[in-house]
Structure formats: C-alpha cells, structure tokens
Amino acid sequence: MKIAHLTSAHPRYDTRIFIKMCHSLAKHGYDVSLIVADGLGNEIKNNVAIFDVGAKTGGRLSRMTKTVKRVLDAALKLNADIYHLHDPELIPIGLKLKKLGKKVIFDAHEDLPKQILGKPYLNKPTKVVLSKAFTLYEHWACPKFDAIIGATAFIRDKFLKINANTVDVNNFPLLDELANTSDWSKKLNEVAYVGDISKIRGIEEVILAMNYTHGVKLNLAGKFGDKALENKVKNQQAWLKVNELGFLNRQQVNEVLAKSKAGLVTFLPAPNHIDAQPNKMFEYMSAGLPIVTSNFPLWREIVEGNQCGFCVNPLNSNEIGDAIQYIVEHPQEAEEMGKNGRKSVEEKYNWLIEEQKLLMLYKGLSA
C-alpha cells in the first residue's frame, strides 16, 4: 500500500507529520512518501522517501498557487493509493485526486475558521468574512474525502458533523523522546518557553512576568515571527533575565528541559486557543516539568485534573511571575507536580495510543 503525505507549509522533519505519522506508518509496513516544499532536495530517511518540489517563494498567495501546483504535480507522479493532506490550501488538490479515484485524508491540525479570527494582520470585518467563507468551503469540500483527522477531540467533533469517517489523532509526545532522569536538586533556577515566539502566544506577558521573579532565568527557545515585536521585548528591563537560545533541534530542546524547573504555555485567549491542546504542554509534562498554562477551561481540566502545574490569567504578568516563583521556591512540590505530569503522559497523553488510531484508520481505508 503506497501512501503519500503532502505539505506545502510544514518543514520536512515536522514532529507530527514526519517524526510521528510517517515513521509510524513506515514502521508498520506501508510504503511511505512525503512531499515537501523547502528547497533542501530529495532524500530517504527512516524508510520514508522525501520529495522536494522546491522552496516556497513570494508571499502567502504565491504559496497557495505556485507551490500548491508543484505539490500536485509531484503527487500525481507518485501515483499513491492514499494521499494524506496536511494543509488547508491543499484541499483543492484533494478534490482533484478524488476525481481520479484516489483515496484522500485531510488532516486538520487547527480549527482554521477560528484561527482566522485571531489573525492580528486582518481587520475585524475581513476576519469575520474570511472565517465564514472558509467554514462554508469546509462544509462543501470535506464530506467528499474518505476520512478526516482532527488534531484534537474538539476538531474531530466539528468535522464529524460533515464527515462520518472522522477520528482524532492527537499530537501527544513520543514516550521516550523527552523523558529525563536528571536529579531535581541539580536543576537550575530556570524556566522554559519553547516554540514559535509571537504576540498571540503571550510572549510580551511572559517577558514582563520575569520582573516579578527573583533569581530566576527564562530559557527562550524559538524564533520571533515579527521583528517589531522582537525589538519591543528586547528593550524591556526584564530581558536581562532571558537566555535567548534561538531555534533548537529536538536533542537541544531535551537538554534545555532537563535543566529547567518549569515549562510555560500562556497563550492569549484567541478563538483558536481556547479549545486547543498545545504540543508543548504535553512535551513539558513528558519531560517531568510542572507547567504554567493559561486558565482556559480545557487546559485547567488537564493541568488541575492531573495536579501537574498552575493555571493563570495569561494577560496578567504578575500572576505568571508568581506561579514561576512558587515553583522555584517549593522544589518538593514542583518535583511532585512534574512526576504527576509524566505519569499522565505515560498513561494517556502519548503517541503510542494515538498511533493505534492512525493505524486503524489506514487499515479501514486499505480494505
């Protein structure tokens, strides 16, 4: 059975697409290819054949036209049995492949209509119109696909209303990847923020929160998406308490988490954040770190239900800083919260469980 995963927007070694899904399918005997658009060339890695259609050029419009056309051409050459799409802009490709008699899965990583409502570069009327338009487009296109995968149960439930063959495959961590046995007493008075750095993810409030801590450093790993925002936060007095690490590979992230005492996920209350399940939340838990997260109902259920951290108002830097300081000053309690988080990952929030859902879906489509 020949499988082709398609992305026009994600990096070739994307954690969900390549490290988890492609690797799991290849491990279980599928002939797996991955089409990407990064200009880094073709290769075979972990028994997955990676085909590069060339780097993305221009802005969003160029990516959604020229790059998508190149992805379609590469997909047709592969002549796969099942095509697995990872970007909304690839939906037209899926419809064309369906007309050719191919089986198509659309993987909804995000609730895009809600995500559009949180775009800072769009004015409110434009957000509302685009969000409603894409909702109508989803309702028209997605019932035509053989299956839909939602990255969360919330996204699954949304698509179940229009496509009965919808499952959730959560982006939970690989059990062994971030596990560490470092002695808590040897950890530094440092906390970690790992991931994309943006206003909507609360970076301004996190930096200002360091003003309310004493003897604590912030390990900041990731890239700024906006130069003006980067300049703004770097001009804050609190920036003196930041270890700027830039983009890190998975092993480097593991090393940072091993020496940190907490992980921060304090996204601002944008429409697509409220019901989201940030990967980093579960990765921090997998690494045995207590977490400081936004106090959204779903996040509160996860954090407080598993006694693995604190939920705070993400708009209140003082509250974020107080939670960080408490964790640093109460090592026994912090270590216990970290163990609780790790235990919950071992029991329910891990890729082994999600892998079985993925394999069952593919087994059904292969029959």
Language model features: what each stretch is:
Residues 4, 149, 183-211, 218-219:
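Conserved donor-binding/catalytic core segment of Leloir-type glycosyltransferases
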Residues 11-15, 201, 251-256, 261-285, ...:
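Nucleotide-sugar-dependent
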Residues 23, 69-76, 96-100, 106, ...:
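Membrane-proximal helix-turn-helix segments that form the acceptor-binding/catalytic region
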Residues 36, 51, 128-180:
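Donor nucleotide-sugar binding/catalytic pocket of nucleotide-sugar-dependent glycosyltransferases
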Residues 39-40, 217-231, 246-247:
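Glycosyltransferase donor-sugar binding loop
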Residues 230-255:
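Nucleotide-activated donor-binding/catalytic signature segment of Leloir-type glycosyltransferases, i.e.
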Residues 305-306, 310-317, 326-332:
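Conserved acidic donor-binding segment of nucleotide-sugar-dependent glycosyltransferases
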Residues 319, 326, 333-348, 357-360:
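A short, well-ordered alpha-helix in the C-terminal region of glycosyltransferases
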